[in-house]
Design a protein with these regions (language model features):
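Non-transmembrane, extramembrane segments of multi-pass ion/lipid transporters
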Residues: 64-73, 237-242
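Select subsegments of transmembrane alpha-helices in polytopic membrane proteins
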Residues: 78-90, 142-150, 253, 355-365
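Membrane-interfacial loop-to-helix junctions in multi-pass inner-membrane proteins
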Residues: 104-112, 131-146
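Alpha-helical transmembrane segments within multi-pass membrane transporters and channels
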Residues: 120-127
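Juxtamembrane helix-capping/reentrant segments at transmembrane boundaries
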Residues: 67-81, 135-143
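Alpha-helical transmembrane segments
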Residues: 2-53, 93-120, 154, 158-175, ...
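Membrane interface segments of multi-pass transport proteins and intramembrane proteases
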Residues: 129-138, 171-182
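Membrane-interface helix-loop junction between the first two transmembrane segments
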Residues: 52-70
């Protein structure tokens, strides 16, 4: 929005002929790096400014977190802490993105739309848990249906409304590989890939959101790495130099990712231990959906496990736990567990680690994964 008013209108109308430093200075609005930086700052400030009123309103509405009985006493003390704070993240991301991005990018609106749809699924889940007093929220089939519909819409827009490249960019390889165009593999097969990515990423972040500051801090790190990747993919010189799939449409996704960075950092201000608010499913599903959607749009699908390595580890720990329990129950008659409790952060907690230590160590691991994802740009 600001791009059109301050650059397209004021600068182009008055900047070239005016001697005013104000009008000439508006030239900076054409640069995606400038707009990304300010989208980050704007989202951060919105989250910080509105955080306290939102938390207070959630508390007044008695939108408190329910804690499962089997969790530790440390977790039981958090019962009643306001949840659904993810609306603060999503709202600040939407406002700052609309303010600072060019609004003629269909990829930008696709990322925003997918994020909002995943947020809607999470909101419904939280609402049923809290207001309807149904502890499990949406049924598994209902939640899956919402996620599948969103994935189908993402694929549909890519197929019918864009010139999206149906190729997969493989890390560590010089050439873009595995063509999946119509002549080789129909794009309908790519739909399965999109479903796998979006459902996997959204649920992985959802599983990670179990400790004060954990999901928000890991999101900040993962989104910072994804911001850098979207920028180099959008710049022809960097893309050619690093042998990436060049996608100029992803430039505005950089602004979107920057807004996510700022919003997650601002939310961490209130979510750091001891947490004053939790993001809830409305936040975690939306963040995971945003990560997956941007990875798909920028052809970084295979880098997503590195970008969000902690999220993947948490999800895999649950898969291992459930699979092993079912297998041993079927074969031995008694279900056995690999971990004391899944996701993995609960295993360490029951092992005697204090929550802040677990969070800080997971943050260190997230930083290492982010650096690894960025290093692949040169390892081709």
């Amino acid at each position: 929005m600001l791009y059109y008013f301050l650059y397209q209108f004021l600068f182009r109308e008055y900047g070239a002929s005016s001697e005013s430093y104000f009008y000439k200075g508006l030239n900076v609005f054409q640069y995606v790096t400038f707009r990304t930086a300010w989208a980050t700052i704007t989202a951060l400030l919105i989250t910080l400014f509105f955080g306290r009123p939102v938390i207070r309103k959630l508390a007044e509405m008695k939108f408190g977190q329910e804690i499962r009985e089997e969790l530790s006493a440390e977790h039981q003390a958090k019962r009643g802490t306001p949840t659904m704070g993810g609306i603060l993240i999503i709202g600040s991301v939407f406002i700052s993105t609309v303010l600072w991005a060019r609004l003629d990018s269909i990829f930008l609106w696709l990322a925003l739309g997918a994020t909002m749809l995943f947020a809607a699924v999470g909101f419904a889940d939280d609402w049923i848990k809290i207001v309807k007093k149904r502890s499990l929220g949406l049924t598994g089939k209902q939640k899956l249906a919402g996620q599948l519909i969103t994935a189908l819409l993402v694929w549909g827009v890519l197929y019918f409304a864009t010139n999206y490249s149906w190729n997969l960019s493989i890390p560590f390889l010089k050439e873009t590989a595995l063509p999946t165009g119509v002549s080789v593999i129909p794009p309908i097969i790519y739909l399965l890939f999109i479903i796998f990515i979006l459902l996997g990423s959204s649920n992985a972040v959802n599983l990670t959101d179990g400790m004060d500051g954990l999901a928000s801090s890991v999101t900040f790190i993962a989104m910072a790495a994804l911001t850098a990747l979207t920028y180099v993919a959008s710049d022809r010189r960097w893309a050619e130099y690093l042998d990436l799939t060049h996608n100029p449409a992803s430039a505005e996704l950089t602004v979107f990712c920057g807004a996510m960075v700022g919003a997650s950092l601002g939310f961490l201000w209130y979510n750091a231990p001891p947490a004053e608010v939790f993001m809830g499913d409305v936040g975690s599903l939306a963040i995971g959906g945003a990560l997956g959607t941007v990875a798909i749009l920028t052809k970084q699908e295979f880098l997503l496990p590195f970008i969000g390595g902690v999220f993947i580890i948490e999800a895999i720990s649950v898969m291992i736990q459930v699979s092993y329990f079912k297998f041993t129950k079927r074969t031995a008659g008694v279900g056995k567990r690999v971990f004391m409790q899944a996701p993995l952060h609960h295993h360490f907690q029951l092992s005697g680690w204090k929550e802040p230590k677990i969070v800080f160590r997971f943050v260190i691991i997230a930083i290492l994964f982010a650096l690894l994802s960025l290093s692949t740009l040169k390892l081709r």
